[in-house]
Amino acid sequence: MSLREPVELLDPSAVGPVYFIAIGGAGMSGVARIYHDLGVEVRGSDQVDSANLRDLASLGVQTWVGHDPSHLAGARTVVVSSAIRPDNPELVEAHRLGLRIWHRSAALAALMLGREGVSIAGTHGKTTTTGMVATMLDCAGADPSYVIGSPLAATGMSSHLGGGEAFVVEADESDGSFLQYPSQIVVVTNVEADHLDNWGTPQAYFDGFVSMATRPEVRYVVTNADDPGAAELACRLESTGTVRVVTYGESEQAEVRLVDLDLNGTTASATLVYGPTQGRLELQVPGRYNLSNAAAAYCVGSLLGISHQDLLTGIASFTGTLRRFQLVGRVADVSVFDDYAHHPTELRATLGAARRVVTGQGRVIACFQPHLFSRTRDFAGEFGSALTLADRVIVSDIYPAREDPIPGVTGELVHDAVIAAGGDSRYVPDKQDLPEALAEEVRPGDLVITLGAGDVTLVGPVLVGLLEGKA
């Protein structure tokens, strides 16, 4: 199904019972939960059991492990994600029965009808910025609804149905989902070519952001003045005069400026200047990139009428989202972190933050699992260069996600690129071997970080267990 054109949306109360294929996924489970909280009958299945599946079942949602056409009995609407293949037996049955079939983005867009929609978009930083906005509004008493791609560390929740006017969503550009959301406020953290397997060319990818930002209901577009792609988008939009553009960043041209940055270990702070108003932005998460994300969140809150001090207080309470520089454990003076970074720019930002956390003779050891064959093919050299920010690199084979293999494309391309860029790398293709390989490498004072959008996240807890056994 094409996501380049908006689909007809119906009020959520008119579409049930709703059946979610792959209901246990990070994105799907959050949407399913809000439909359930609205009183819509929700059911769904997934290939494997998971905490998300069990959480939904505990709420009374009927769930199955495994896909079977019989599960669709009584359903009126079927919700799928881009990861669902056309030959999925439940999707085939939905077509045969003539049921309404919505992409996840349409199901989420329907929830935003009648609300003050806020879409957080950008190649990098969407999840964290969405989490910051949700936390900030909640602390200010605005009780927002939100759907985030990863659970908030403080609550373990990736979605919430609030009683306030604001509905904040992480707007994914990878498959064109962000074109569906009816939003009055749009944030673009950055624009850097990615997902070319779907968009084809960098220009088409950029034009997708233009299309999202020029939907008829958009009133404000918040853009990062420090990012070339977002700055180009701002210029394009300002020339049309159809929306109000608000810029943020360290640039002197930014409307909301960050100055006097302090990047200190696992925290960060800066002075935020907005016209005659200024105050200290204090974060519990590390990195220059997170200060940028916080400035974006501040802009959104200001546009929604939240006071300056409430904004600073709310953002200061944000403790992160899962899989974003998340501490897995500390054993024998070895720190183990996990991060979702899966693009060269994200690797550079995350490893840069890691270097500021490690102290003394400690090393940064990066364990990277490339995500998608097409992305590995397109960015192998850039991955290699970015990973040289680590003192030691272990590269695993590719997590395929939705893609079929591409001949000659393996994780070894990234390993070779690290070596070519002057880095120190080891290729361990089987992810089952990664915990032991890392345990052999570490010494007191080291920081280990697993990196990637796939199942490399499972490595950290196993590594911590191995290190505890040796302690």
Curated annotation (Swiss-Prot):
Keywords in alphabetical order: ATP-binding, Cell cycle, Cell division, Cell shape, Cell wall biogenesis/degradation, Cytoplasm, Ligase, Nucleotide-binding, Peptidoglycan synthesis
Enzyme class, UniProt record, top EC level: ligase
Matching InterPro entries: Mur-like_cat_sf, Mur_ligase_C, Mur_ligase_C_dom_sf, Mur_ligase_cen, Mur_ligase_N, MurCDEF_pg_biosynth, UDP-N-AcMur_Ala_ligase_MurC
Pathway, per record: Cell wall biogenesis; peptidoglycan biosynthesis
Pfam families xrefs: Mur_ligase, Mur_ligase_C, Mur_ligase_M
Single GO biological process annotation from the record: cell division
Gene3D superfamilies: Mur ligase, C-terminal domain (3.90.190.20), Mur-like, catalytic domain (3.40.1190.10), NAD(P)-binding Rossmann-like Domain (3.40.50.720)
Subcellular location: Cytoplasm
UniProt catalytic activity: UDP-N-acetyl-alpha-D-muramate + L-alanine + ATP = UDP-N-acetyl-alpha-D-muramoyl-L-alanine + ADP + phosphate + H(+)
Disulphide-bonded residues: none
Any one of the GO CC terms: cytoplasm
Main location as per UniProt: cytoplasm
Residues reported to bind ATP: 122-128
Family assignment from sequence similarity: Belongs to the MurCDEF family.
NCBIfam families, alphabetized: murC
Reported function: Cell wall formation.
Name of the featured protein: UDP-N-acetylmuramate--L-alanine ligase
Organism annotation: Cutibacterium acnes (strain DSM 16379 / KPA171202) (Propionibacterium acnes)
Source organism phylogeny: Bacteria, Bacillati, Actinomycetota, Actinomycetes, Propionibacteriales
